[in-house]
Amino acid sequence: MSLLIRSGPSLLTRTTKKTNTRQQSLVVRRKIRYFVGKKSYQEKTEQMKKTISLVIALISCLTIGAQEFQHYFTDATLRIDYTFTGNAKSQAIAVDELCKIPRWYGKRQRLAELPVEGNGQITVRDHRSQRVIYRNSFSTLFQEWLSYDEAKTSTKAFQNVFLVPYPKDTIDVTLDLKNNRRQTMATLTHTVAPADILIRRIGEKAVTPYETLQQAADTTRCIHIAYVAEGYTESEMPVFIDDCRTAMEALFAHEPFKSMRSRFNIVAVKATSEESGTSEPGRGIWKNTALHSNFNTFYSDRYLTTLHLKDLHDWLAGTPYEHIIVLVNTNNYGGGGILNSYNLSMTHHPAFKPVVVHEFGHSFAGLGDEYAYGKEEIPMYPHDIEPWEPNLTTLVDFNSKWADMVKEKTPVPTPQPATLGQPNAKKTHWETGAYEPAGYSQHGVYRPYPDCRMRTNENPEFCPVCQRAITRMINFYTDKQ
């Protein structure tokens, strides 16, 4: 990229000196003549013009993106803590607290674009012009809880934390929550003045100790991941670092992460717990840990999460992070992943590696679960609405998903291959199509491939559709095409 930027001015900058003009003319002619072949001089000239135009366009896009960020934001983070409250009938959003953190580790290009819709969006507008200057999408445990029967009879409140670049001038922040029909169910707009004396400054002192596990090739255009210790005591930190390396290598054993490894910057944050392990309410076990994680989320035995997002971000304040992977010191099976919130996984169960990668598929790329629970139906995806997840479809708008990857002769819906589920099954004849079940539903929701990391722990890789979705996400965050 830097070579292209340097070559631009030498070819395109005008000079008043005739000698320099003649030299530039010779350079251009030599460049043109380098494109050997039977093309005419005019064709070669046109080809060279197109090449130069592409270089100019690329440089312009990079420059405009950088100017946009520098015009509206400083190199710092505005952390906004919210409380989401309500039940199945009504929901509300309230601002809890504002914090300022040194440095900004999120995107600096494509600021107003969303790579996926998510179950909600945070939108930042310049207060004076009302121009959208930053957007991001997310999902939350609160919205998931609304789909359970408990939400029909009780009201609850959930913590949520969002990070946006710190503004230079006053901004309006809008938070929208969507239901499973992709309709807005709650919204809040509030104003933030960057000079507000009640914005708490954190992350400047007493930063949680951390180790850098991998440094990106370009730290200005990379994806920052922080592994966070949960349920590790002071004496167990060496075990945590080993677990981080295991999780990291498991992720980079999967394409497209493997091919794009240099775009990731990874640290291990040593959040120390008073007690080892995690809480297991189903067994009457409660532990005093850094993030207060627990099994039995929403009364599901293996659903391991934390509801204490403010504590999580307090531990992370001052460390280089955007995407969060919480590693829990337990040998019991469990985990969870929420888009642009966090990924949480047990570490000492035999399925640790596939689970931590699977959950990162949720939290990083917005991928949906491609399985169903036997005969149990969880009405997460209405069959008359196209899901926003890139690897799920109800066929309502299949063309917006992976229809372009399905061969013309492949039937849609697609029957399961006879070898699916068999040990050492040959996958050479497997094809991209639309397979049931998926999205916790036996019928009406479809996945792209017979098996995938988003479906089972046994499958060793992401399917072609998920790989494409992850590639697009990595390119989005690192501003690559």
Name the predicted role of every residue range.
Residues 1-3, 7-8, 15, 25-70:
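Bacterial Sec-dependent N-terminal signal peptides
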Residues 72-198:
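Beta-strand-enriched, solvent-exposed domains that form extended recognition/catalytic surfaces
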Residues 197-255, 268-278:
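Fold-level signature of zinc-dependent metallopeptidase catalytic domains
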Residues 231-234, 272-276, 330-334, 350-352, ...:
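Solvent-exposed loop/turn segments at secondary-structure junctions
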Residues 239, 336-357:
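Short pre-active-site segment immediately N-terminal to the catalytic Zn-binding motif
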Residues 263-339:
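Active-site-proximal segments of metallohydrolase catalytic domains
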Residues 353-370:
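Active-site recognition of the HExxH zinc-binding catalytic motif
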